């Protein structure tokens, strides 16, 4: 009688199943990796937030403000960034930040690509930006607008019609603004820039401590103080008085 062949069916089956299991595990790990989620985007709504006239934004995220009827707050962007947002109203101020704080990425977590917070509000009187985000405001009018910038972010302001405007920059950020104001106080500490060439003011108090630059337009009295290599340019028929120390230059010309 012929000798039967060895029975390898079960070991081969076991090896096949083991290979399938390893393959499935590898696929599962690939799907759950950070790289697979890096492109995920999401949107979140904070419809209950209202009754604020100021905004305080801290972190790496961008803010886009539209002046309109009623209040609306929503965010979109990297899903990880949106999930990490902390937005609330405190003492008439919309406070925007991150749940995770204190790292060198100004709050960014696990390399997320950031979010944009979209805000609609009837009027705005003040905005503070700390970090590396950008702040866009379509327009503003009324008694005053106070802008404070700390870090490397940017303010981009559309057309304003104000009685008083205050801008304070600490760091390397920039502010671009147009329109008109009866009086303006603009201050830079560091290497920031204020592009207000399209802003016509009645009177102005301009101050630079560092290497920043200010451009503005005025036909009124303008007081200029420069400590360092910063420059001030005033277009129009302004009556300028200057003071300071350093190589910085003040130019007042039509």
Q: At which residue positions do the language-model features occur?
A:
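Conserved acidic catalytic centers in enzymes
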Residues: 59, 151, 228
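Short, surface-exposed interaction patches in beta-rich subdomains
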Residues: 159, 174-254
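Acidic (Asp/Glu) and glycine-rich low-complexity loops/linkers
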Residues: 2-12, 17, 22-130, 134-148, ...
